[in-house]
């Protein structure tokens, strides 16, 4: 019995992390086996790599170095946490996965979507998300949310200029055109309760198609 791999994607400030935690609580309350995790991170080695990637003092980091570090963290996270959970038949909710690398490093950093896809295919093999929920929000609104959130520690990506975040959004559009069958777009500018409702609807539809 295989599990269900659901990834949450979107630009900075879209609110996907908050919604993911809500989804975990709702699904767990229904008695479903759920594993919630994040990238980069989720396990000790990947969390250590995360600290290097997002450290705001690492301003000299080369774009290729950044892409390779993400892929390395992804591989370890996948092998140590995601794949075992899926083999156990669990629902895995993951805050970011390969599409973040394609949008951020492939497009916004200018490395090329195909090039970054190649790096990540080596890292993840044939393990791709069953469903990807994209939280759509204008870059200006996302940055505004980040700035007004005093409880959020600003990382290196948060501090990028508006132009970069605009490119990230464009990158996601390119990625969604490439993998339309698994992407579901949600308007993340709506009230949190409505966004949660929309995300739950996507997940429930996916659950109907499998037997957990």
From Swiss-Prot:
One of its GO terms (molecular function) is ATP binding. It comes from the Bacteria. Belongs to the thymidylate kinase family. Its EC number is 2.7.4.9. InterPro entries: P-loop_NTPase, Thymidylate_kin-like_dom, Thymidylate_kin_CS, Thymidylate_kinase. One of its GO terms (biological process) is dTDP biosynthetic process. Phosphorylation of dTMP to form dTDP in both de novo and salvage pathways of dTTP synthesis. The keyword RNA-binding does not apply. The lineage of its organism: Bacteria, Bacillati, Bacillota, Bacilli, Bacillales. Keywords: ATP-binding, Kinase, Nucleotide biosynthesis, Nucleotide-binding, Transferase. One of its GO terms (cellular component) is cytosol. ATP binds at residues 10-17. NCBIfam families: DTMP_kinase. Transmembrane segments: none annotated. It catalyses: dTMP + ATP = dTDP + ADP. This is Thymidylate kinase. The keyword Metal-binding does not apply.
